[in-house]
Each structure stands twice: as C-alpha cells, then as structure tokens.
C-alpha cells in the first residue's frame, strides 16, 4: 500500500480517481462556468486562470484575470489563456481548507483552516492560516462516493475549488482553534514575529519549494501565534 502524503502519491494510489486531479473537469462537474484554453467565455467578468493539472500545488500559474465575451476570436486562437490552462468563473469569499474523515458512507469535517491572502494579485502567497472550527458545507453525492483514506477540500465560501485525495491540514493536528500560522516567505521582513515559534518546512532542501523555478515566492517555514484566549 502506498503511503499518501503528497498528490503524486495519491495519483499512484488511486488510479480510479485521477479525474479529481483535472481541475477543469472538476469545475465542470460542479456546474461552474469554465473552459479550456481555446474556448471563449460566455460572459464578462473576472476568472481564475490555472493549469488543468497541477499535482505540485502551491498555486503554480494561478492568477485572476478579466475576460470578455467580446473576445471570442482572440480566445479561440489561444490569446489570453496559455495552452494547458483553463478558465473558471471567479468566486469571492473566504478561503477554507477542510480535512475530512470517512464515517460510514459520508465524509465528515474534522479540522479546518481559513487562508488569508496578502493580495488577490498573488494567489500563491498566503499571509496567514487561521485554525477554525470546521464549517459544515453540503457536499455533492459524488464526493461522498470517493472511497479513499483521507480527503481535503478547498472552498471559496461554500464553493468547492479543489479536492485532494489526502490530508491537507497537518498543522491543525498540532494546533488549537484560534491559533494563527504565518507562512514565512523568502525576502520578506518578519522582525515583528521573531518572538513566535518557528516551524520549519517538512523538507530541509529549499529546492523542494521552488518547483524547479516555477515559483517565484519561496516558503521557508511558518511562525505560529498561539491563541491565548
């Protein structure tokens, strides 16, 4: 049995669920307005542009962009959306990462973090993860049909944005409700946080967090602010 820690382990462990890795297929299954590069949007608005597949994670290539239904010719000729990427309607709201455990035939939330971005101009760079009581969102029946050991789902408010066939909130296991986890980004100033507990990355090899140059923001670890209330 393969020990599933990262998404590439899940790809090998659960070949029957590899469609979950296809973020475009997931978006369409959820009923969102979405399409691949080469297909025009049907309405004006902001969209999230992402690779169809990104088992590495960390928001590689993801960005927010305004697209117009008047750009049909341009978009059909691969302008605005890179090949291998897709567009999906943009959802405002709070970003949640929720871990689930299997109870009978259902997935039940067991822990959760709320992610706060520094800016919507950079979807990789979270400013803070806050440990919260897990919210209960209604999941589609087909999500409950996914039979794996662990499940992590990311949301914008109650809208599913990603499903991972593994746990995602390991930091919750050693934290309490109200604790705040601050990612430490290379080049940023954290003088005001140096009194806090520092939690290093799982791997000590910095190259593991550069995605071979595909990430310009390199995470060095975390500072944890304990909730004392």
Where are each of the predicted segments found?
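Active-site nucleotide/adenylate-binding loops and adjacent lid/helix of ATP-dependent enzymes
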Residues: 2-141
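ATP-dependent carboxylate activation and anion-phosphoryl transfer catalytic cores
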Residues: 58, 106-107, 116-229
């Amino acid at each position: 049995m393969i020990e599933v820690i990262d998404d590439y382990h899940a790809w090998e462990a659960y070949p029957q669920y590899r469609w979950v890795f296809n973020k475009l297929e997931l978006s369409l299954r959820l009923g969102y307005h979405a399409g691949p590069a080469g297909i025009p949007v049907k309405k004006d608005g902001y969209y999230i542009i992402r690779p169809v597949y990104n088992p590495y994670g960390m928001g590689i290539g993801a960005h927010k962009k305004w697209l117009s239904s008047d750009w049909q010719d341009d978009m059909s000729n691969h302008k605005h959306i890179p090949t291998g990427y897709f567009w999906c309607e943009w959802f405002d709201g709070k970003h949640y990462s929720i871990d689930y455990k299997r109870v009978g035939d259902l997935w039940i939330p067991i822990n959760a973090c709320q992610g706060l971005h520094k800016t919507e101009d950079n979807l990789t760079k979270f400013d803070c993860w806050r440990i919260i009581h897990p919210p209960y969102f209604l999941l589609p029946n087909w999500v409950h049909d996914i039979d794996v050991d662990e499940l992590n789902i990311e949301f914008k408010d109650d809208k599913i944005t990603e499903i991972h066939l593994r746990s995602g909130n390991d930091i919750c296991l050693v934290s309490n409700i109200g604790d705040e986890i601050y990612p430490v980004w290379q080049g940023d100033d954290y003088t005001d946080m140096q009194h806090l507990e520092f939690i290093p990355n799982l791997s000590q090899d910095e190259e593991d967090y550069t995605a071979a140059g595909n990430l310009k923001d390199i995470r060095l670890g975390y500072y944890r602010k304990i909730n004392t209330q």
